[in-house]
Amino acid sequence: MWIPISLTELKECISHAELKLDGESLNFWNLIKIPPQKWKEKEYGNDGGGFWAVAVFGNTVIFYNDIEDGFNISSYAVYGQISEYASEQAELNWVVERIYNSLKQNAQL
């Protein structure tokens, strides 16, 4: 079993990522971020008490997978429950910029 990341360590990761965001991406992050909270995930999340959710946009959640040491995107149907396990090892700023750029591209269509 892995040792889940502490809230203090997670906040350090978030702060580090925020320093890499600027302009519209940072504004977008400030709109979607939430205080970190544990969300349930049925496949792998039980052992660690869930995964830390850090942002919500529509029916999408950004969460930290501390098994794989990276931020991930999932849909959700019930607030507090991650629908799809994901195991990317992405930095938070990459995930935020990916979502933001995807929204910008779709808005221009």
Show where each model-derived region lies.
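N-terminal non-globular leader segments, chiefly Sec-dependent signal peptides
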Residues: 1-40, 79-109
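Charged low-complexity stretches with an acidic bias
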Residues: 61-89
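Amphipathic, interaction-prone secondary-structure segments
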Residues: 30-70
